[in-house]
């Protein structure tokens, strides 16, 4: 019988766990989620969540999204290889229904799992966005 728990060993806990994934990750995205992932040396997948107050203003909505993501991961972890995943949310997610978010997450678990397999093409590096607060001194 499958083990459907979501214990401490299935979570990313320390800043070093997160920073390892941010260095050349495999990426997958939908309109409301971005997943970053890297293979790990554990015997199970692990999940880290980042739901920024800047993206989702109300605490009850941030908590709803985190509960939903943990539950969806817990039910799908047996289909995911040994990879570490960081889930980030985008603006506008708090207006979506639970069913829509679950559908997107289920699709993303499959997509990121394929992109982390050995032999999968490496993604291009992140492109740094220009800082919006710096004003251009360009003269016309």
From Swiss-Prot:
UniProt keywords, alphabetically: Endonuclease, Hydrolase, Nuclease, RNA-binding, tRNA processing
Region Disordered, annotated ranges: 115-140
Quaternary data: Consists of a catalytic RNA component (M1 or rnpB) and a protein subunit.
The family this protein is said to belong to: Belongs to the RnpA family.
Gene3D superfamilies: 3.30.230.10
Superkingdom of the organism of origin: Bacteria
Recorded catalytic activity of this chain's protein: Endonucleolytic cleavage of RNA, removing 5'-extranucleotides from tRNA precursor
Keyword DNA damage (UniProt): no
GO annotation, cellular component aspect: ribonuclease P complex
GO molecular function: 3'-tRNA processing endoribonuclease activity; ribonuclease P activity; tRNA binding
Lineage of source species: Bacteria, Pseudomonadati, Pseudomonadota, Gammaproteobacteria, Alteromonadales
Family matches, as InterPro entries: Ribosomal_Su5_D2-typ_SF, Ribsml_uS5_D2-typ_fold_subgr, RNase_P, RNase_P_CS
EC number assigned by the record: 3.1.26.5
Name of the protein this chain belongs to: Ribonuclease P protein component
Described function: RNaseP catalyzes the removal of the 5'-leader sequence from pre-tRNA to produce the mature 5'-terminus. It can also cleave other RNA substrates such as 4.5S RNA. The protein component plays an auxiliary but essential role in vivo by binding to the 5'-leader sequence and broadening the substrate specificity of the ribozyme.
GO BP: tRNA 5'-leader removal
């Amino acid at each position: 019988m499958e083990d459907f728990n979501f214990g401490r060993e299935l979570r990313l806990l320390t800043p070093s766990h997160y920073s390892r994934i941010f260095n050349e990750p495999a990426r997958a995205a939908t309109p409301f989620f971005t997943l970053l992932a890297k293979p790990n040396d554990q015997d199970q997948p692990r999940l880290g969540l980042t739901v920024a107050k800047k993206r989702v203003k109300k605490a009850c909505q941030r908590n709803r999204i985190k509960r939903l993501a943990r539950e969806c991961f817990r039910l799908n972890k047996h289909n995911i290889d040994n990879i570490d995943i960081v889930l980030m949310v985008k603006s506008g997610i708090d207006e979506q229904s639970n069913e829509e978010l679950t559908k997107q997450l289920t699709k993303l678990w499959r997509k990121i799992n394929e992109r982390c397999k050995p032999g999968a093409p490496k993604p291009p590096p992140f492109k740094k966005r220009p800082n919006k607060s710096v004003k251009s001194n360009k003269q016309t």
